């Protein structure tokens, strides 16, 4: 019998395993995939290092920055775009990034009005829950509908919000974006910067390896968990092939949208079951396109497009470039259909030829069932505290239920730090 079993090998699970092992507990980590990393996944494509999932970090993210400092890992800051495109209805307009940001800022300032009072301490969403509830009850679309905006302001702001939400705006809660804004120093510019400019040299894999090397623990890949049985003394974890592992405590670091695939005995309390049934809203796509055209760093946004944000990530010496796009629904974009990708490219950033495209379908992936956490309306008022509560010897963890940077690597590390320490304490 192990002291602690950790279920899930993303950043939350690996951090929790390390923290329990540092406290001299024997730890077994079970991961359903044949790799660690969860919703981060470093790779290489056409000679470029790419991230199929989470990628960006920032010094405003304290847990991530502490781990980067500990590991001695440098970061890389991408160049800002030289040219920006945006759409008002079907009309494409272009100008400088500053010009488009000024349009976005006029709408953004109205969208976030009041958030400083609702989220005075962004790492503690319960600090002013009464004030936060007014926003928590709204979808992003409902919040947008409250605002007096010109057509241009509305379309630019809608496209910005779609790229952040990675979900249809009538399904995504306003607080997920408002929290991101608050954590970024209540600034549009920093909200954009924290989510898209700073990456880890060597990729997210380098940081994950550094954390996992921080203390010895066993790990078993390709071991999806189907059932968890727990009582006052122990936890039994059964994998899909029928193998049963036992421990004195367990950390379940599984994405919210995948938790429903695990059978708990005794059943989880009704408040947790309601939260799991609600899930989180993200269902988008992150697509990488190898394109040929004008060798300039630029991006374009268009509301309602299959990838409503598309921008240059890297230029190649042969005149080609790597573009990255984000869309609100993975089912609207098939990276394997280059003809469709070309048609969609022409409709947001014309003048480029799509040579190849790739993406991972996180929505279809049974181990994630979605991308970064974008909570639905009512999450913080009704579900957040319940999902952070222990159930006997079972501790839940993950970026989806973090207090701070939920949906980011930082939120996963935050949650893993807390869960690993808690599980070690439960062992005694």
Question: Which residues does each PLM region occupy?
Answer:
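Dinucleotide-binding Rossmann-like beta1-alpha1 core, especially the glycine-rich loop
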Residues: 48-118
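Central beta-strand plus flanking loop segment that forms part of the substrate or channel wall
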Residues: 270-298
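Flavin (primarily FAD) binding-site architecture
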Residues: 252-269
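Core beta-strand elements of the Rossmann-like FAD/NAD(P) dinucleotide-binding domain
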Residues: 2, 240-249
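Conserved flavin/dinucleotide-binding core of flavoenzymes
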Residues: 15, 23, 234, 299-428
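Glycine-rich FAD pyrophosphate-binding loop
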Residues: 21-45
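Active-site/ligand-binding neighborhood in enzyme catalytic cores
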Residues: 124-223, 234, 253, 263, ...
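N-terminal Rossmann-like FAD-binding beta1-loop-alpha1 element of flavoenzymes
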Residues: 2-29
């Amino acid at each position: 019998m192990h002291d602690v079993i950790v279920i899930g090998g993303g950043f939350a699970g690996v951090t929790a395993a390390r923290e329990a092992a540092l406290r001299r507990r024997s730890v077994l980590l079970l991961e359903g995939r044949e790799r660690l990393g969860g919703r981060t996944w470093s790779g290489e494509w056409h000679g470029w290092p790419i991230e199929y999932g989470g990628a960006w970090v920032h010094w405003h993210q304290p847990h991530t920055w502490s781990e980067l400092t500990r590991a001695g890992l440098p970061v890389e800051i991408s160049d800002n775009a030289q040219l920006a495109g945006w759409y008002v209805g079907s009309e494409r307009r272009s100008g400088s990034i500053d010009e488009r940001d000024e349009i976005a800022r006029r709408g953004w300032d109205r969208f976030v009005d009041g958030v400083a009072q609702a989220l005075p301490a962004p790492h503690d969403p319960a600090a002013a829950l009464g004030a936060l509830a007014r926003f928590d009850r709204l979808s992003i679309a409902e919040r947008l509908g409250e605002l007096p905006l010109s057509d241009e302001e509305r379309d630019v702001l809608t496209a910005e919000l779609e790229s952040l939400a990675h979900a249809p705006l009538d399904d995504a809660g306003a607080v997920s974006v408002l929290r991101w804004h608050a954590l970024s120093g209540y600034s549009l510019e920093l909200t954009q910067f924290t989510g898209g400019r700073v990456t880890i040299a060597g990729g997210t894999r380098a940081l994950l390896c550094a954390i996992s090397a921080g203390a010895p623990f066993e790990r078993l890949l390709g071991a999806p968990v189907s059932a968890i049985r727990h009582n006052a003394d122990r936890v039994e974890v059964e994998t899909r092939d029928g193998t049963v592992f036992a421990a004195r405590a367990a950390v379940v670091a599984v994405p919210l949208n995948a938790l429903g695939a695990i059978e708990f005995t005794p059943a989880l309390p009704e408040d947790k079951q309601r939260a799991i049934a609600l899930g989180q809203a993200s269902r988008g796509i992150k697509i990488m396109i190898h394109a040929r055209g004008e060798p300039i760093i630029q991006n374009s946004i268009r509301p309602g497009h299959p990838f409503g944000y598309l921008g240059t990530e890297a230029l190649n010496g042969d005149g080609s470039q790597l573009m990255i796009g984000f869309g609100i629904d993975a089912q609207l974009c098939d990276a394997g259909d280059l003809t469709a990708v070309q048609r969609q490219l022409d409709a947001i950033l014309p003048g480029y030829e799509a040579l190849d495209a790739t993406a991972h379908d996180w929505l279809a992936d049974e181990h994630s069932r979605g991308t970064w956490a974008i909570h639905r309306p009512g999450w913080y008022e009704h579900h957040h505290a319940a999902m952070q509560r222990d159930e006997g010897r079972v501790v839940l963890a993950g970026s989806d239920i973090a207090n701070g940077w939920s949906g980011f690597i930082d939120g996963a590390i935050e949650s893993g730090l807390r869960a690993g320490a808690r599980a070690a304490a439960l062992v005694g």
